[in-house]
């Protein structure tokens, strides 16, 4: 999953970067309001961690621009030193998914991100059962019959993203963007994603049939449940 950190306090931004990268997230940074608005206009993100006190403007303006874009469901967590209740209410009213006052624990941030994933995809817990495969979002593991599969980080991310979007066709471009980040930085070979999906499907099929894992010709993939 990809995350845009909009935070001008570089030490905090880099701490979040290191912590979330170790948890498997793909990180991008925007240090100012202008660069944040430019990025969200071009790319979509699974999460936007948004500071309100930016050097060239208010983070609320970034939130407003995001919400004005069509067909976007980027989850927004506001991170700010502002403690006023009015600011919290304003952020939530304008479409933020959560509000975390500074200073905060990185583990709490991660827990809130997991909670948003559960709400967004209507999950009761961090585990999802897909045709006998148990995907654990928090531990980033996939197992079958109590045996853990040896998936690479990217294979897990692909499976995770497809599972969270089950019964929907996920395009190759969308999959690339959410697993590898900025699509412009990814190998332009059209077979790039297909190779990773082929390896993932091979590992899944080795323990159980995967006729539910569909390739939608010329578009992408779909997991049917």
Positions of predicted regions on the chain:
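Short boundary/linker motifs that mark transitions into or out of structured domains
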Residues: 129-141, 219
């Amino acid at each position: 999953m990809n995350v845009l950190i909009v935070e001008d306090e570089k030490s905090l931004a880099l701490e979040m970067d290191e912590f979330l990268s170790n948890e498997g997230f793909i990180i991008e940074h925007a240090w100012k309001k202008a660069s944040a608005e430019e990025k969200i206009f071009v790319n979509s993100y699974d999460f936007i961690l948004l500071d309100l006190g930016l050097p060239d403007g208010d983070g609320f303006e970034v939130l407003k621009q995001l919400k004005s874009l069509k067909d976007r469901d980027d989850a927004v967590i506001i991170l700010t030193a502002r403690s006023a209740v009015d600011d919290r209410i304003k952020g939530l009213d304008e479409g933020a998914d959560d509000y975390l006052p500074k200073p905060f624990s990185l583990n709490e941030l991660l827990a809130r991100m997991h909670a948003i994933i559960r709400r967004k995809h209507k999950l009761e817990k961090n585990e999802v059962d897909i045709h006998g495969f148990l995907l654990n979002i928090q531990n980033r593991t996939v197992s079958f019959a109590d045996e853990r599969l040896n998936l690479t980080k990217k294979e897990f991310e692909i499976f995770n993203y497809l599972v969270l979007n089950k019964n929907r066709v996920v395009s190759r471009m969308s999959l690339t963007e959410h697993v590898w980040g900025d699509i412009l930085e990814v190998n332009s070979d059209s077979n790039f994603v297909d190779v990773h999906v082929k390896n993932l499907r091979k590992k899944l099929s080795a323990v159980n049939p995967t006729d539910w894992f569909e390739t939608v010709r010329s578009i992408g993939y779909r997991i049917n449940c």
